[in-house]
Amino acid sequence: MLGGYDLEMQEIERLLINHNCSYSNASLNWQNAHLSQYAHEISALSKSDTNIYGIELFEDITPPPNYIRIDHHNDFSDRPTSLIQVAELLNIELNRYQQLIAANDVGYIPAMMSLGASTEEISAIRLADRQAQGVTDNDEELAIKSINNLEQCNDLIIVKALTPKFSPICDRLFPYKALLIYTDQELTYYGDLVPKLKQLFEEHINSHKIYYGGNDSYLGIAKKAFSPNEIINIISQIKLLYENV
Protein backbone atom coordinates (compact mmCIF):
# COMPACT_ATOMS: atom_id res chain seq x y z
CA MET A 1 0.00 0.00 0.00
CA LEU A 2 1.61 3.20 -1.23
CA GLY A 3 1.85 6.42 0.74
CA GLY A 4 2.21 10.05 -0.33
CA TYR A 5 3.51 10.44 -3.84
CA ASP A 6 6.96 11.77 -4.63
CA LEU A 7 9.84 10.49 -6.76
CA GLU A 8 10.75 7.78 -4.26
CA MET A 9 7.18 6.46 -4.11
CA GLN A 10 6.98 6.61 -7.90
CA GLU A 11 10.12 4.48 -8.17
CA ILE A 12 8.83 2.04 -5.55
CA GLU A 13 5.69 1.57 -7.64
CA ARG A 14 7.84 0.95 -10.71
CA LEU A 15 9.80 -1.74 -8.83
CA LEU A 16 6.59 -3.44 -7.72
CA ILE A 17 5.25 -3.45 -11.28
CA ASN A 18 8.50 -4.78 -12.74
CA HIS A 19 8.57 -7.62 -10.21
CA ASN A 20 4.88 -8.53 -10.56
CA CYS A 21 4.01 -7.62 -6.98
CA SER A 22 0.42 -6.96 -5.94
CA TYR A 23 -0.07 -3.49 -4.53
CA SER A 24 -2.64 -0.77 -3.97
CA ASN A 25 -2.22 2.89 -4.85
CA ALA A 26 -4.82 5.28 -3.48
CA SER A 27 -3.10 8.26 -5.17
CA LEU A 28 -2.29 9.91 -1.85
CA ASN A 29 -0.26 13.01 -1.06
CA TRP A 30 1.77 13.76 2.06
CA GLN A 31 -1.22 15.33 3.80
CA ASN A 32 -3.67 12.42 3.45
CA ALA A 33 -1.26 9.46 3.53
CA HIS A 34 -3.17 7.66 6.29
CA LEU A 35 -3.56 3.95 6.86
CA SER A 36 -7.34 4.39 6.97
CA GLN A 37 -7.28 5.19 3.27
CA TYR A 38 -6.72 1.45 2.78
CA ALA A 39 -9.29 0.24 5.31
CA HIS A 40 -11.04 -1.94 2.71
CA GLU A 41 -7.82 -3.69 1.65
CA ILE A 42 -6.76 -4.18 5.27
CA SER A 43 -10.13 -5.66 6.22
CA ALA A 44 -9.93 -8.13 3.34
CA LEU A 45 -6.42 -9.32 4.24
CA SER A 46 -6.24 -8.89 8.02
CA LYS A 47 -7.04 -12.54 8.77
CA SER A 48 -4.95 -14.05 5.98
CA ASP A 49 -1.41 -15.41 6.12
CA THR A 50 -0.29 -12.66 3.75
CA ASN A 51 1.87 -9.84 5.06
CA ILE A 52 0.46 -6.38 4.44
CA TYR A 53 3.09 -3.71 3.81
CA GLY A 54 2.25 -0.04 4.28
CA ILE A 55 4.76 2.43 2.90
CA GLU A 56 5.00 5.76 4.72
CA LEU A 57 1.42 5.68 5.99
CA PHE A 58 0.36 7.42 9.21
CA GLU A 59 -1.31 4.82 11.41
CA ASP A 60 -4.56 6.58 12.25
CA ILE A 61 -6.22 3.17 12.68
CA THR A 62 -4.88 0.13 14.50
CA PRO A 63 -3.07 -2.14 12.02
CA PRO A 64 -3.65 -5.91 12.09
CA PRO A 65 -0.94 -8.32 13.34
CA ASN A 66 0.15 -9.11 9.77
CA TYR A 67 0.82 -5.45 8.96
CA ILE A 68 4.42 -4.30 8.43
CA ARG A 69 5.31 -0.61 8.33
CA ILE A 70 7.92 0.58 5.86
CA ASP A 71 9.11 4.07 6.71
CA HIS A 72 12.14 6.20 7.55
CA HIS A 73 10.56 9.18 9.30
CA ASN A 74 10.07 10.12 12.98
CA ASP A 75 10.52 7.01 15.16
CA PHE A 76 11.68 5.08 12.05
CA SER A 77 14.28 7.70 11.09
CA ASP A 78 17.17 5.36 11.90
CA ARG A 79 16.13 3.02 9.06
CA PRO A 80 17.16 3.07 5.39
CA THR A 81 14.93 4.89 2.92
CA SER A 82 11.69 3.18 1.95
CA LEU A 83 13.04 2.50 -1.54
CA ILE A 84 16.02 0.64 -0.09
CA GLN A 85 13.77 -1.33 2.28
CA VAL A 86 11.52 -2.41 -0.60
CA ALA A 87 14.56 -3.36 -2.70
CA GLU A 88 15.84 -5.50 0.17
CA LEU A 89 12.46 -7.25 0.44
CA LEU A 90 12.60 -7.98 -3.29
CA ASN A 91 16.26 -9.03 -3.00
CA ILE A 92 17.42 -6.67 -5.73
CA GLU A 93 20.21 -4.10 -6.03
CA LEU A 94 19.39 -0.52 -6.89
CA ASN A 95 20.90 0.97 -10.03
CA ARG A 96 22.68 4.33 -10.09
CA TYR A 97 19.51 6.32 -10.77
CA GLN A 98 17.63 4.56 -7.97
CA GLN A 99 20.52 5.10 -5.55
CA LEU A 100 20.35 8.82 -6.27
CA ILE A 101 16.58 8.80 -5.72
CA ALA A 102 17.10 7.16 -2.33
CA ALA A 103 19.86 9.62 -1.42
CA ASN A 104 17.72 12.57 -2.48
CA ASP A 105 14.81 11.36 -0.37
CA VAL A 106 16.79 10.99 2.82
CA GLY A 107 19.40 13.74 2.49
CA TYR A 108 18.40 15.99 -0.42
CA ILE A 109 21.15 17.49 -2.61
CA PRO A 110 24.03 17.02 -0.10
CA ALA A 111 23.34 13.28 0.02
CA MET A 112 23.46 13.06 -3.78
CA MET A 113 26.68 15.07 -3.81
CA SER A 114 28.19 12.57 -1.35
CA LEU A 115 27.59 9.89 -3.99
CA GLY A 116 29.51 11.95 -6.52
CA ALA A 117 26.42 13.05 -8.44
CA SER A 118 27.06 15.48 -11.27
CA THR A 119 25.25 18.81 -11.58
CA GLU A 120 23.22 17.31 -14.42
CA GLU A 121 22.24 14.25 -12.35
CA ILE A 122 21.19 16.41 -9.40
CA SER A 123 19.14 18.73 -11.61
CA ALA A 124 17.43 15.77 -13.27
CA ILE A 125 16.55 14.11 -9.95
CA ARG A 126 15.25 17.33 -8.42
CA LEU A 127 13.12 18.13 -11.48
CA ALA A 128 11.70 14.59 -11.52
CA ASP A 129 10.93 14.81 -7.79
CA ARG A 130 9.12 18.12 -8.17
CA GLN A 131 7.08 16.73 -11.05
CA ALA A 132 6.21 13.59 -9.06
CA GLN A 133 4.98 15.84 -6.23
CA GLY A 134 2.67 17.61 -8.66
CA VAL A 135 4.60 20.87 -8.90
CA THR A 136 3.22 22.90 -11.83
CA ASP A 137 4.70 25.72 -13.91
CA ASN A 138 2.55 28.09 -11.87
CA ASP A 139 4.08 26.72 -8.65
CA GLU A 140 7.53 27.37 -10.10
CA GLU A 141 6.57 30.99 -10.87
CA LEU A 142 5.05 31.48 -7.42
CA ALA A 143 8.24 30.09 -5.88
CA ILE A 144 10.24 32.85 -7.57
CA LYS A 145 7.82 35.51 -6.32
CA SER A 146 8.00 34.04 -2.80
CA ILE A 147 11.80 34.18 -2.80
CA ASN A 148 11.74 37.84 -3.83
CA ASN A 149 10.21 38.65 -0.42
CA LEU A 150 12.41 36.47 1.78
CA GLU A 151 13.55 37.53 5.25
CA GLN A 152 17.04 36.90 6.62
CA CYS A 153 17.80 36.28 10.31
CA ASN A 154 21.56 35.68 10.49
CA ASP A 155 22.02 32.21 8.94
CA LEU A 156 18.27 31.56 8.75
CA ILE A 157 16.36 32.36 5.55
CA ILE A 158 12.60 32.72 6.06
CA VAL A 159 10.17 32.55 3.14
CA LYS A 160 6.40 32.92 3.23
CA ALA A 161 5.35 30.71 0.33
CA LEU A 162 2.72 31.74 -2.17
CA THR A 163 2.41 28.08 -3.16
CA PRO A 164 1.86 24.97 -0.99
CA LYS A 165 4.71 23.32 -2.92
CA PHE A 166 7.93 24.08 -1.05
CA SER A 167 10.40 22.09 -3.18
CA PRO A 168 10.81 24.69 -5.99
CA ILE A 169 11.69 27.26 -3.31
CA CYS A 170 14.23 24.94 -1.66
CA ASP A 171 15.87 24.04 -4.95
CA ARG A 172 16.27 27.66 -6.04
CA LEU A 173 17.79 28.76 -2.71
CA PHE A 174 20.24 25.86 -2.32
CA PRO A 175 22.87 25.98 -0.90
CA TYR A 176 21.73 27.50 2.39
CA LYS A 177 22.69 27.01 6.03
CA ALA A 178 19.12 27.10 7.31
CA LEU A 179 15.79 27.65 5.58
CA LEU A 180 12.27 28.03 6.95
CA ILE A 181 9.31 28.02 4.54
CA TYR A 182 5.75 28.51 5.70
CA THR A 183 2.16 29.31 4.79
CA ASP A 184 -0.83 29.97 7.02
CA GLN A 185 -1.35 26.19 7.26
CA GLU A 186 2.08 24.56 7.37
CA LEU A 187 5.78 25.06 7.94
CA THR A 188 9.02 23.25 7.20
CA TYR A 189 12.46 23.99 8.60
CA TYR A 190 15.64 22.73 6.93
CA GLY A 191 18.87 23.04 8.87
CA ASP A 192 21.21 21.69 11.52
CA LEU A 193 19.12 22.74 14.53
CA VAL A 194 16.59 19.92 14.05
CA PRO A 195 17.88 18.00 17.11
CA LYS A 196 17.35 21.10 19.26
CA LEU A 197 13.90 21.72 17.73
CA LYS A 198 12.92 18.11 18.44
CA GLN A 199 13.54 18.79 22.12
CA LEU A 200 11.76 22.14 21.97
CA PHE A 201 8.66 20.71 20.30
CA GLU A 202 8.72 17.20 21.79
CA GLU A 203 5.11 17.41 22.96
CA HIS A 204 3.89 18.27 19.45
CA ILE A 205 5.99 15.46 17.95
CA ASN A 206 4.43 12.97 20.35
CA SER A 207 0.96 14.16 19.34
CA HIS A 208 1.90 13.79 15.64
CA LYS A 209 1.52 17.50 14.93
CA ILE A 210 5.21 17.86 14.08
CA TYR A 211 7.34 15.42 12.09
CA TYR A 212 11.02 15.16 11.15
CA GLY A 213 13.27 13.10 8.91
CA GLY A 214 16.15 13.12 6.45
CA ASN A 215 18.71 12.20 9.12
CA ASP A 216 17.47 15.16 11.16
CA SER A 217 17.85 17.54 8.22
CA TYR A 218 14.27 18.82 8.26
CA LEU A 219 11.32 19.31 10.60
CA GLY A 220 7.79 20.25 9.63
CA ILE A 221 4.30 20.69 10.99
CA ALA A 222 1.34 18.71 9.74
CA LYS A 223 -1.01 20.71 7.55
CA LYS A 224 -3.71 22.54 9.53
CA ALA A 225 -2.33 21.18 12.82
CA PHE A 226 -1.81 24.74 14.04
CA SER A 227 -3.60 28.05 13.56
CA PRO A 228 -1.86 30.86 11.61
CA ASN A 229 -1.05 32.61 14.89
CA GLU A 230 0.42 29.43 16.36
CA ILE A 231 2.59 29.02 13.26
CA ILE A 232 3.88 32.57 13.69
CA ASN A 233 4.69 31.72 17.32
CA ILE A 234 6.64 28.63 16.23
CA ILE A 235 8.57 30.75 13.72
CA SER A 236 9.38 33.24 16.49
CA GLN A 237 10.78 30.44 18.66
CA ILE A 238 12.99 29.22 15.81
CA LYS A 239 14.14 32.76 14.95
CA LEU A 240 15.13 33.29 18.58
CA LEU A 241 17.65 30.46 18.31
CA TYR A 242 19.37 32.28 15.45
CA GLU A 243 19.11 35.75 16.96
CA ASN A 244 21.03 34.49 19.99
CA VAL A 245 23.87 33.01 17.93
Predicted regions and their residues:
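Short alpha-helices
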Residues: 70-128
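Short, glycine/charged-enriched secondary-structure capping and boundary segments
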Residues: 14-17, 66-69, 82-84
